[in-house]
Amino acid sequence: MEERNIELDIRRWLDLSKSGKAKEAKDFYYENLFDTVIERFEKNNQQVISGSSVDVLISILGFSPEPIVLGAKLLKPKTHIIIHDAGVSLNEENNRIIGKYLTDYHFVELQDETFSCLYDTLKEQLSIHPAQHCVINITGGKKSMSASAGIFARDFFCDLIYVDYSKYDPSTRRPEPGSEFLNLVYSPYRDLPELFHK
């Protein structure tokens, strides 16, 4: 029954999106689809990151709050830090959706988007919140931010994740709801070049 209903809801969401009713489509998504998307994501991705619980999750926030919520709901970190640039902090939808679905997180605003600023901010956050198991979610970040975070993850023994998708609708420029999955981009336990890539 749930599968049939989500398929009907996806069609309804697509119809609203394609007919130019962007606000109605967005409202419909959050009212009728996102809870199911979260449930599926948690159910289908429990084994992606194995080992100890996540002490610190650092998420890079872009213009869509969904990857931040999905990553945090799945990983259930002890501490969740959401890093964003100045432009993103003005996005009311981000604040509303993150506040609705998550309860324990800290926002940190970047002074600028340079490599050194993001790298130093990540380093500062790990000194404030020491962690044995740190995960960085790069889904929302710009490419330059993702590159900085990737280098930082390598230097500081952090997992690097990306909320990806298997189905994409080009007309809405969004993933099909329910097709999201967790991509473990880098893991120091799996990917250290000197150990595993000879």
State what each model feature region is.
Residues 1-134, 144-198:
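Long, low-complexity, Lys/Arg-enriched
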Residues 135-139:
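Short glycine-rich or small-residue beta-strand-to-loop segments that form or flank ligand, phosphate
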